[in-house]
Design a protein with these regions (language model features):
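Generic detector of short, well-ordered, non-transmembrane alpha-helical segments enriched
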Residues: 6, 380, 481-482, 666, ...
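Hydrophobic, well-ordered secondary-structure elements that form the walls
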Residues: 437, 485, 788, 824, ...
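Compositionally biased, intrinsically disordered low-complexity regions
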Residues: 14, 440, 495, 501-502, ...
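Extended, charged helical/alpha-beta scaffold domains that provide interaction surfaces
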Residues: 36, 309-317, 323-330, 560, ...
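Short, Lys/Glu-rich amphipathic helical modules
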Residues: 432-445, 679-680, 734-739, 898
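Conserved P-loop NTPase motor core
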Residues: 1-600, 604-622, 671-672, 688, ...
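Short Cys/His-rich zinc-binding micro-motifs
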Residues: 887-906, 910
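Proline-rich intrinsically disordered, low-complexity coils
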Residues: 66, 197, 223, 434, ...
Length: 913
């Protein structure tokens, strides 16, 4: 037992203890089963209004939980024909408590999430259920939506193709299903709109994240980016591509695979200087050219077609490295996407300008309560706890797990490994046992498909290129004789049933008969209060289901006798979780099954991270290319290598988060001020405060150093009289200035003059029919948006270059904090200056319209990929938003410092201010 496990056991924090506590609450729910069974449909439905009344009356959700869970469990039975298992209730309690429920594949996570969603929807503040793709959001939202609606709870579904009005309506529902990408992008867009009614989200109160490890761990380093069209030509991408195409690896450039970086050698630098006619490519004047060359190198040397991306209809489409799915409409940042387009000889689109960005770390930490489900989370509990303050509870399985996980089989070469994989498939297929073969990318899946096709083995292939057939393929992957080759996308959110899936087959037949999905959804339930056409469809469903179940039951027995579904992994992933997800496709609900990984020393994980210990063992044994080595010790060595990679990646994410915290504090301040303006608050006091600030700042700049201020300087006079004072203001105080010893004496006079001047402006503009309060909002919004977007780019540039400070024995993160704070202050000053100048000096004949921060119809949504510029990310907590409305971006003394240190402003960068 480790010290950590010993500590947990000593202080009652072991998983077993947590499960015992959950079981006690579960028993209280189960004890009410008969009570809710006895209710009619209308009586059961009326419970929702009753529960809401109790919440409004002050009863806590924990107090209502046993009744709410019991009522909804009964609703699931009546609508969907499923009686939730005790372990699903335990998982639901765990989610309600704001934790991660680790539930194995096939344990019913989709239904589990409905229990806490229903309970928390009683507050009428909104619940978000987050999925990894549009298909699952739509499928789960429609499926579970029938149950929620039966109980009088509204459900919205967010998908990529919705317009703003549809999104707003979906978020206004009690429960909203959507993907992490869509919800993150909606948050960014909400902070770019120019009117509050254009916002679609209504807050972040409770979120349930499906496949939480994929979203909060795997994608934590990938910022969401909204970008607009840049104005630079694309010619240089094509020129750089032609140059890079002539370079040779090792001679002209080197690749650091672990760091995923590429660098020109001295010879490569000389070739570049000669080709482009520059004297020194390292000069600052040539930085842009060097950037084009490096991105072209990354496109050629590191980004692989059918692995990292595919080309379809003349377009480069990213393949999600964790799920294997196509990410249509997403683009790599920092010119990498354009470099790939040039490499593939398709149209090169103009580089974009980052307008808004956030990471999933930032986004999900805004929720007041967040929870998650996955089949694989315990290995990452330290990270969940350290970054998100989420602990992991392993929920017991409903039936004992009997799956056999065999030791890895290791080969010297990829050729030998794949030859063995093909033989294993042929051998097992001959018995009729269903086989699922997991591959790491599209390229490998298609190669393996060709190999077994030549051996005459019929099979299905599931990858990013044919994802539309995913449901069909997965539904029958457990049938006798089935052979399925799939990338990582297979099985997240879907179950493989041994012998086939009678429910899926019955629904498919009904669709073929012309019945709508809505009718089919209602037909599969047991509630009595439905129209005649649904009752007729229910009879049809029951008939088809019984017919197919006879077939699948017979096949189920045969597959059970054959050993269940056999999983073949063709390569270990960097993360043990991804491997465990593949293993988890077999052995659901107590079914038999088996898994085994086939590995070669040429695989990326082995070559980069496992070679120093395992390779010598292989050499000592004198293995041939096609000679396998299978041993428990070897499997442990491989898992040790994976642990090292996981630790390395966690360290990277922690470092990124340190930088993220800085940018996020600044974003909270800007978005908070922007929100105040959008809500229609009277901004006049804010404007006056900004004027005072500009006068004070001018006084500070003109301090003579001998205890007095020189107000006669032409620069100070001209600046303020062009900004917020009438011409000649200083002249009328010429005699008094000579007698003044304290700057406050003069600034107080100027305050009065500036406020009087502004009052005159208000009278004049109001006489012209201009709403002064709206004019203030328009001017302030435009100034904030313009300078904030420029600031994002400047922060990107600072982040790119800050790492060099380490060579000077300085802490890059601390340097970044300090410099970014200065940059933020400069930006705030420019926002104030622009706002004051326009309000006091601009010629106005009619009220200008609020400019959109960006025309969303012309934006692109994307990600900073490997090799793309990492956009600034940070920590986004609900309580950190500013309430001080004195000036845009102004930091209150007791607010968190924008440098990201976590200290109050008065104890950090504002000390002495």
């Amino acid at each position: 037992m480790s010290l950590k496990d010993l500590f947990k056991s000593m202080f009652g924090m072991s998983n077993e203890t947590q499960v015992r506590k959950l079981r006690k609450i579960t028993d209280a729910v189960l004890a009410k089963e008969d009570e809710y069974k006895a209710l009619s449909d209308s009586e059961l439905r009326a419970k929702t209004a009753e529960f809401k009344g109790l919440v409004q009356g002050g009863m806590t959700l924990d107090e209502i939980l046993p009744d709410a869970f019991a009522a909804f469990r009964e609703a699931v039975w009546r609508v969907d024909g499923k009686r939730l298992f005790p372990v699903q209730i335990m998982g639901g309690v765990c989610l309600h408590q704001g934790r991660i429920a680790e539930m194995k594949t096939g344990e019913g996570k989709t239904h589990t999430a409905t229990l806490p969603a229903y309970l928390n929807a009683l507050t009428e503040k909104g619940v978000h259920i987050v999925t990894v793709n549009d298909y699952l959001a739509k499928f789960q939202g429609e499926w579970m939506g029938n149950i929620f609606r039966f109980m009088g709870v509204s459900v919205g579904i967010i998908t990529h193709d919705l317009d703003n009005a549809q999104r707003r309506a979906a978020y206004a529902c009690d429960i909203t299903y959507g993907t992490n990408n869509e919800m993150g992008f909606d948050y960014l867009r909400d902070n770019m709109v120019n009117r509050e009614p254009d916002m679609v989200q209504r807050g972040h109160v409770f979120g349930i994240v499906d496949e939480v490890d994929s979203i909060l761990i795997d994608e934590a380093r990938t910022p969401l980016i909204i970008s607009g069209q840049g104005d630079q030509s694309t010619d240089m991408y094509e020129k750089a591509d032609r140059f890079v195409g002539r370079l040779k690896k090792d001679d002209d450039y080197t690749i650091a695979e672990k760091e995923k970086a590429v660098t020109l050698t001295e010879r490569g630098v000389e070739l570049a200087q000669r080709h482009f006619g520059v004297e020194n490519i390292a000069d600052l004047d040539n930085a842009e050219l060097y950037h084009y060359i490096l991105q072209a190198l990354k496109a050629h040397a590191m980004m692989k077609r059918d692995v990292d991306y595919v080309v379809q209809d003349g377009e480069v489409i990213i393949v999600d490295e964790f799920t294997g799915r196509l990410m249509v409409g997403r683009r790599y940042s920092d010119g990498l996407h354009q470099a790939i387009e040039a490499k593939e000889r398709v149209k090169v689109n103009r580089e974009s300008k980052t307008l808004a960005t956030i990471t999933f770390q930032n986004y999900f930490r805004m929720y007041q309560k967040i929870s998650g489900m996955t089949g694989t989370a315990k290995t990452e509990e330290e990270e969940f706890q350290g970054i998100y303050n989420l602990d992991v509870v392993q929920i017991p399985t409903n039936m004992p797990m009997v799956r056999k996980d065999y030791n890895d089989v290791v080969y010297k070469t990829r050729k030998g490994k794949f030859a063995a994989v093909v033989e294993e498939i042929v051998k097992r297929h001959a018995t009729g046992q269903p086989i699922l073969v997991g591959t790491v990318n599209v390229e490998t899946s298609e190669m393996l498909s060709r190999y077994i096709e030549m051996r005459g083995v019929p099979h299905e292939i599931l990858n990013a290129k044919n994802h539309a057939r995913e449901a069909d393929i997965i539904a029958q992957a457990g049938s006798v004789d089935a052979v399925t080759i799939a990338t990582n996308m297979a099985g997240r959110g879907t179950d493989i049933l041994l012998g086939g899936n009678p429910d899926y087959l019955a629904r498919r037949r009904m669709r073929q008969d012309g019945l709508s999905d809505e009718i089919i959804m209602e037909a599969v339930g047991h509630n009595e209060d439905v129209p005649p056409e649904v009752l007729a469809a229910r009879e049809t469903y029951n008939r088809y289901f019984a017919e197919f179940k006879r077939e699948t039951d017979a096949e189920h027995e045969r597959v059970m006798a054959l050993g269940g579904l056999h999983i073949i992994g063709t390569e270990r992933h960097e993360s043990r979780r991804i491997d465990n997800q593949l293993r988890g496709r077999a052995g659901r609900q107590g079914d038999p099954g088996s898994t085994q990984f086939f590995i070669s020393m040429e695989d990326d994980v082995m070559r980069l991270f496992g070679s120093e210990r395992i390779a010598p063992m292989i050499e000592r044994l004198g293995m041939g290319d096609d000679q396998p080595l299978e041993a428990g010790l070897l499997t442990k060595q491989i898992e040790t290598a994976q642990k090292r990679i996981e630790g390395h990646n966690y360290d990277i994410r922690k470092t990124v988060l340190q930088y993220d915290d800085v940018m996020n504090k600044q974003r909270e301040l800007i978005y908070g001020q922007r929100g105040d303006i959008l809500k229609g608050d009277n901004m006049r006091e804010t404007v006056i405060s900004m004027v005072h600030n500009m006068i004070d700042a001018t006084a500070e700049r003109n301090f003579t150093g001998d205890g007095s201020f020189d107000w006669s300087l032409d620069e100070a006079r001209d600046y303020l009289e062009r900004l917020c004072l009438k011409p000649g203001t200083f002249a009328k105080y010429a005699a008094q200035i000579k007698e003044m010893n304290e700057p406050e004496e003069m600034t107080k006079l100027l305050y009065v003059d500036a406020e009087a001047f502004y009052a005159e402006r208000e009278t004049l503009l109001t006489a012209l029919g201009i709403d002064m309060r709206e004019f203030e909002r328009v001017v302030m919004l435009n100034a904030i948006d313009h300078h904030w977007m420029d600031h994002i780019d400047a922060m990107d540039d600072l982040r790119d270059g800050i790492g060099l400070r380490a060579y000077g024995q300085r802490n890059p993160v601390q340097e970044y904090r300090l410099e970014s704070f200065d940059m933020f202050n400069d930006m705030v000053h420019m926002i104030r200056e622009d706002t004051v100048r326009r309000l006091f000096q601009a010629r106005v004949e009619r009220l200008p319209e609020r400019h959109k921060a960006v025309d969303v119809s012309k934006t692109q949504e994307g990600f900073a990929g490997e090799g793309g510029k990492p956009a600034q990310n940070g920590q986004a907590k609900q309580g950190g938003a500013p309430t001080n409305k004195s000036q845009p971006g102004a930091v209150g003394r007791n607010q968190p410092c924008p440098c990201g240190s976590g200290k109050k402003y008065k104890h950090c960068c504002g000390k002495g201010a």
